[in-house]
Amino acid sequence: NATHSGEVTGSGALTIADNIVDEANLKVSNSPTNGYGLVARSGNTGGMTWEALGGGKILQVITSNDSSTRSTTSTSFVTASSLLSINITPSASSSKIFFIGSISLYQTNGNAFPEITIYRDSTDLSGGAGLGGFRAGDGNQNMVFTAISHLDSPSSTSQINYRIYIKSGSGDSVALQQNNNISTFTAFEIGA
């Protein structure tokens, strides 16, 4: 077996012995850092560099819940509950905020059509369309847990308030957490 130093080239298949290629033998443009990965980058010496493996990391999780009955007859979105509210300060402006929620909805009239949405400070993230609720009525009282999810890109590193809002489609009474059911609302900051 021949011993080589520097770059090795050949026109046919070359075999490298086991346990020979290590950090010292790689042609990389920078020094390694624990937790970093080796990434191909054209233009760098050797075409490789050590970089933080980004994207998709959960940076923080905040959960809120409420079990007190809250009701409204408003046909415009109003604050559903001061407890179904999350304050979050994104770590980077490129972060996304992903929400999931299980919201206990109740309508006193089967055709009240309660709707819920998420507000970022004063902005309705559904654009007024709502993110969940009763879409059909049967004339009876109804209670249901509505699952909601939404992905937001706030482009901010300042504290942001996200809150559940509710409205009645008909002006009849609608409620959250009727009979002390529990609603939950969770935010995940996802690194870019």
Question: Which ranges hold each PLM region?
Answer:
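Extracellular repetitive beta-rich solenoid segments
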Residues: 1-57, 92-93, 192
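Short, solvent-exposed loop/turn segments enriched in Ser/Thr/Gly
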Residues: 34, 80-82
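N-terminal leader/pro-regions and domain N-caps
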Residues: 53-67
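Terminal beta-strand-rich extracellular "head" domains
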Residues: 64-65, 71-76, 89-96, 100-159, ...
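Extended, low-complexity regulatory regions
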Residues: 84-86
